[in-house]
């Protein structure tokens, strides 16, 4: 999971330079995997508030 996070965060830092035509395979696969994990409920996005 940490590797996926690192790839996504690195891509986010380079977001102005990334297009669908030039995105590298590692980034594309990481994004697709995270989307699949979110869709299946294996991952979720949440913000911890007071707790």
Swiss-Prot record:
GO CC field: cytoplasm
A Gene Ontology BP annotation from the UniProt entry: lysine biosynthetic process via diaminopimelate
InterPro entries: THP_succinylTrfase_dom1, THP_succinylTrfase_N_sf
Superkingdom in the source lineage: Bacteria
Organism: Klebsiella oxytoca
GO molecular function, one term: 2,3,4,5-tetrahydropyridine-2,6-dicarboxylate N-succinyltransferase activity
Assembly and binders: Homotrimer.
EC number: 2.3.1.117
Alphabetized Pfam families for the sequence: THDPS_N_2
Subcellular location: Cytoplasm
Assigned keywords, A-Z: Acyltransferase, Amino-acid biosynthesis, Cytoplasm, Diaminopimelate biosynthesis, Lysine biosynthesis, Repeat, Transferase
Family: Belongs to the transferase hexapeptide repeat family.
Enzymatic reactions: (S)-2,3,4,5-tetrahydrodipicolinate + succinyl-CoA + H2O = (S)-2-succinylamino-6-oxoheptanedioate + CoA
Protein's recorded name: 2,3,4,5-tetrahydropyridine-2,6-dicarboxylate N-succinyltransferase
Pathway named in the protein's UniProt entry: Amino-acid biosynthesis; L-lysine biosynthesis via DAP pathway; LL-2,6-diaminopimelate from (S)-tetrahydrodipicolinate (succinylase route): step 1/3
